[in-house]
Amino acid sequence: MSDYENDDECWSVLEGFRVTLTSVIDPSRITPYLRQCKVLNPDDEEQVLSDPNLVIRKRKVGVLLDILQRTGHKGYVAFLESLELYYPQLYKKVTGKEPARVFSMIIDASGESGLTQLLMTEVMKLQKKVQDLTALLSSKDDFIKELRVKDSLLRKHQERVQRLKEECEAGSRELKRCKEENYDLAMRLAHQSEEKGAALMRNRDLQLEIDQLKHSLMKAEDDCKVERKHTLKLRHAMEQRPSQELLWELQQEKALLQARVQELEASVQEGKLDRSSPYIQVLEEDWRQALRDHQEQANTIFSLRKDLRQGEARRLRCMEEKEMFELQCLALRKDSKMYKDRIEAILLQMEEVAIERDQAIATREELHAQHARGLQEKDALRKQVRELGEKADELQLQVFQCEAQLLAVEGRLRRQQLETLVLSSDLEDGSPRRSQELSLPQDLEDTQLSDKGCLAGGGSPKQPFAALHQEQVLRNPHDAGLSSGEPPEKERRRLKESFENYRRKRALRKMQKGWRQGEEDRENTTGSDNTDTEGS
């Protein structure tokens, strides 16, 4: 087993790998083999495994190495054989040789029966570990299935939430589009109202211009009439003007009067010398009296003519005022007629605008009513779609719950079946193993690794159980039968058929129970709705 004859030299070689050994080795695995090799007594084993001072695994391994080092070369060989059995890679690293699994130390110490007992103990431990792992795998498988069901439920809820979000976004987009359309319609209505107001203002301005032109025309007609009357007056005055013959006669009379005045002046100058005569005095007195009378008559005539001129002026002024008043009255009549026509036109326009306003209000109310009906129908349809979606989700949840219950039942049945198979295999494997089972631990380790690989790859947990059972059948072909004498395939088929029948019956019972519960819930819901409506 070792090329070193000196004990110190052997253990000095192992001291070079002490760090690696303490970090890799588990003392609880190699102590049974060392105890069978009689290099480790129960007290030492209890000290290594149960000492409260040795809590860390590395310290336990260090104490174990120190105890084995006290046994010398025998402990060194037993330790290497334990490494060869349980840690072949570490054995190859320490010794540089491939593990041969000769087990000379345990054979020399306890014989082949001790080796067989050790291997049987290890096999039982591994079988128990395999059972624990299979139970753990089945529970993990059930937990994974439950998680898948929960994941499907979560995805369903997420899809529903996403659908509700999409519906909400679609509704918001529709609302935004309706708002934009309403805003566009309002803008168009405002533009049309502005255009209509501008057209009305232009129409009013044109009407005012027409009225001003009419007024200007009437003023021009009045001015024309006044000028015509003045022209007629001037023509009448020109017609009443004295003629040339009358003017010539008046000029002759004037000349005669001037000549007479000159004669009188001459006679007056000649008679200045005879002023003292009474006749001349009488004449002068008469002349003065006549002159005074003439002056008075002239003054009277002048005053009468002045009064006449003033009366004529007043008459003319009154006539002009009368004509002016007549013209103003005519203008006022025409203005009143114009304003009356304008007011009538405005009233007609207001009546037309009121009719158009009533029509627009009626159209708007009708459109609002149609929009309200459309919104009510849309809300009713959305409510119906939401109720149908909720019903579909509830049905889907019921389906998922049924699947989860079925999976749980399958898991329980599988565990029961596994327990029955394990119990039957334990009963069948009560006889002693053959020597060819010496390589079983390594094969079981390979089987465990392959099972873990299958589980990590998404395989079914039934595969390692089937492989283990097939291996047991191949190793013990004469013990493969069950206590009833039936082959395992037929027994498995029978169990599967009974499980299928049980699952169908259970599913039918659950469906009937769910239908009854749903009918009772609907009856209770309709009853509560009726009571609510009656109470409202």
Curated annotation (Swiss-Prot):
Residues joined by cross-link Glycyl lysine isopeptide (Lys-Gly) (interchain with G-Cter in ubiquitin): K125
Subcellular location: Cytoplasm
Regulation: Maintained in an autoinhibited state via homodimerization in which the CARD domain forms an extensive interaction with the adjacent linker and coiled-coil regions. Activation downstream of C-type lectin receptors, by phosphorylation by PRKCD and/or ubiquitination by TRIM62, triggers disruption of the CARD domain-coiled coil interface, CARD9 homooligomerization and BCL10 recruitment, followed by activation of NF-kappa-B and MAP kinase p38 pathways. Zinc-binding inhibits activation by stabilizing the CARD ground-state conformation and restricting its capacity to form BCL10-nucleating filaments.
Annotated phenotype, changing R35Q: In IMD103; abolished homooligomerization and formation of BCL10-nucleating filaments; reduced cytokine production in response to C.albicans infection; reduced production IgG antibodies in response to C.albicans infection
Binding site for Zn(2+): D3, C10, H73
PROSITE patterns the UniProt entry points to: CARD
Effect of L115I: Disruption of the linker region, relieving autoinhibition and leading to activation of NF-kappa-B. Constitutively forms BCL10-nucleating filaments
Record text about domains: The linker region, also named autoinhibitory interface, is required to prevent constitutive activation and maintain CARD9 in an autoinhibitory state. Disruption of this region triggers polymerization and activation, leading to formation of BCL10-nucleating filaments.
Effect of C37A: Does not affect zinc-binbing
GO terms assigned for molecular function: CARD domain binding; identical protein binding; metal ion binding; protein homodimerization activity; signaling adaptor activity
Disease named in the record: Immunodeficiency 103, susceptibility to fungal infections: An autosomal recessive primary immunodeficiency disorder with altered immune responses and impaired clearance of fungal infections, selective against Candida. It is characterized by persistent and/or recurrent infections of the skin, nails and mucous membranes caused by organisms of the genus Candida, mainly Candida albicans.
Gene3D superfamilies: Death Domain, Fas
Organism: Homo sapiens (Human)
Composition-biased stretches (Basic and acidic residues): 487-502
Keywords, comma-separated and alphabetical: Adaptive immunity, Coiled coil, Cytoplasm, Disease variant, Immunity, Innate immunity, Isopeptide bond, Metal-binding, Phosphoprotein, Ubl conjugation, Zinc
Protein name: Caspase recruitment domain-containing protein 9
InterPro entries for the chain: CARD, CARD_CARD9, DEATH-like_dom_sf
Coiled-coil ranges (or none): 117-277, 332-419
